[in-house]
Amino acid sequence: MAAATAEPLAVAVAVAHTATAGTDHSPAPLPPPPPHCNYKSKLQEYLQQANKQLPIYCTKCKGEHHQLKFKSTVMVDGEEFSSTFCHRRVKDAEQDAAKVAYDTLLERKETETDDTDVFELIDQDVVFSKSILHEYTTKTKTDQPEYSVTKTEGSVTPYVSSVSFAGHTYTGGAARNKKDAEQKAARAAVKSLLATNYTSMAKIVRSKEKLIRAISPSGYNKGIDSNPTNKKLPFAPIKFTPPSIFKLYDGEIDMLSVPQALFAPLVAAEEPKVRPAAEPASNPSEQAVHVSKKHKDNKVRGPEVKEERVAQ
């Protein structure tokens, strides 16, 4: 009887041991290393372009000495970003943290809500407003805008345009011609869409940044935009100051204006008075008489000189 009860007991113990062996909890495998991409270099380059401080990494160790796990945290501009998983190597943990920081900063830059730069680009120039609105309608698959222009007589800026788009009508400022009036109406629509659908419209505006920056120094429509009340600008005549030239009179310097100098009589420089020499006679007979007189004078004067020497 005892042998009969011992056999089923041994079978039960064996079954229980097998069940407990099957439910043994082994450590979960670690995640694979991150893909081969140097996110640390990308993050550092991004921060250098943004004129920010370089990232600082801090890695912590977990687990037993024979099975260590590393989790890294990177500090960027006072903000911390931690790695998603624990890794077997410190290098992989830092790359994971750099990837989290890099992806977060890029996404934040694309969806940032800083309206100042976008509105400044729109206000700088209106020449690309119609193209921006047209590109927006193409991407959102909506109907193209329709423009209407009205003219007011007796005004420096007689044209005013309105644009109908997506069930709304937007009116721009006054302009000197129809083309500028339509651009201003499109700019009013773009500003309104920035308030309601900022993300998609802001991307389109920023894509035109280089073109707007390049054309803005030309002063396109700046005179009209600076006078939104449509008042007459004050007229200020330009005064020209004629240049001066210098004239010398007997060692003194006088300053004359250009008109006076042009019509002033010219002053000739005084030449020294020199007694002109006697011109020789043109007649050959007269020249012969003149030579004979010289010989006679020499003959007469010769004895007188000798007499004076004898008297001495």
Curated annotation (Swiss-Prot):
Gene3D superfamilies: 3.30.160.20
This protein's UniProt keywords: Repeat, RNA-binding
SUPFAM superfamilies recorded: dsRNA-binding domain-like
Chain intervals for the UniProt region annotation (Disordered): 273-312
SS bond list: none
Bias (Basic and acidic residues): 299-312
Pfam families, per the entry: dsrm (PF00035)
GO terms (BP aspect): regulation of gene expression; RNA processing
DRBM domain: residues covered: 38-107, 128-195
GO cellular component, one term: nucleus
Keyword RNA-binding: yes
MF terms (GO), sorted A to Z: double-stranded RNA binding; ribonuclease III activity
Function: Binds double-stranded RNA.
PANTHER family: DRBM DOMAIN-CONTAINING PROTEIN, PTHR46031
Protein name: Double-stranded RNA-binding protein 4
Gene source species: Oryza sativa subsp. japonica
